[in-house]
Amino acid sequence: MRLIILDTAEYVGEWSAKYVMKRINDFKPGPDRYFTLGLPTGSTPLGMYRHLIKFHQQGRISFKYVKTFNMDEYVDLPRDHPESYHYFMWHNFFKHIDIDPENVHILDGNAPDLVAECDAFEEKIRAAGGIELFIGGIGPDGHIAFNEPGSSLASRTRVKTLAQDTLEANARFFGNDISKVPKQALTVGVATVMDAREVMIMILGSHKAFALYKAIEEGVNHMWTVSAFQQHPHTIMICDEDATLELRVKTVKYFKDCYKLSADGLEQATLRN
């Protein structure tokens, strides 16, 4: 596991976008070889999306031969609702780049058979050859996608009833009216993300510091689902300084030293000077 600690949330977004761009460009995707990318929603990846849009506009990256799979979607929320993840992705990312809509895969929370929708999503991932890079964020309780505390670490894409804490946290997006927050969602499972060849998890802010501590310094625990990625062979966790407040000083120093000595760290230091 790699932990990359950067000064600010803005720099996390920039670094993440550069990493995604490098992975796609190095892969050299084409009509017979698509790059498959797993994507999150929420405030955490917005900076990354903004930078990827900028890089695309500069001609530094194309998404023509990229297939995407999003992590989750609310149940019974219209696609054109401002809080639906379909709406979020199209308005914050997809409509600004050259991706073919046929290559975008987002779970349909209005499907007549939700279980069949989840099974079909897993099959689409398999048919695409699996996911090269799955990007995620986490909640203050360490959940990834809608795999909340207590979720099986062997879980696949499924229907999930949301916890009361999640409903209360998301009420701010629905006019602070908890009755308007969808009670269920479709979500990829922990094992779905673990199957990706590489996982990059973004953590921003002091309110997620305890979750990062649980993910890095303690053992694997289904009450902190992000901790499962300790066992993935290629996990990158990238965070800002505020997110490290619960980590031991020696832990922070160790990972900062590792980054400075890495090729990525040397390259980024050069870019910033």
From Swiss-Prot:
Its EC number is 3.5.99.6. Its main location: cytoplasm. The active site is at 72 (proton acceptor), 141 (for ring-opening step), 143 (proton acceptor), 148 (for ring-opening step). One of its GO terms (cellular component) is cytoplasm. Pfam families: Glucosamine_iso (PF01182). Gene3D superfamilies: 3.40.50.1360. It is found in: Cytoplasm. It is an enzyme of class 3 (hydrolase). Pathway: Nucleotide-sugar biosynthesis; UDP-N-acetyl-alpha-D-glucosamine biosynthesis; alpha-D-glucosamine 6-phosphate from D-fructose 6-phosphate: step 1/1. Catalyzes the reversible conversion of alpha-D-glucosamine 6-phosphate (GlcN-6P) into beta-D-fructose 6-phosphate (Fru-6P) and ammonium ion, a regulatory reaction step in de novo uridine diphosphate-N-acetyl-alpha-D-glucosamine (UDP-GlcNAc) biosynthesis via hexosamine pathway. This is Glucosamine-6-phosphate deaminase. The lineage of its organism: Eukaryota, Metazoa, Ecdysozoa, Arthropoda, Hexapoda. The gene is Gnpda1.
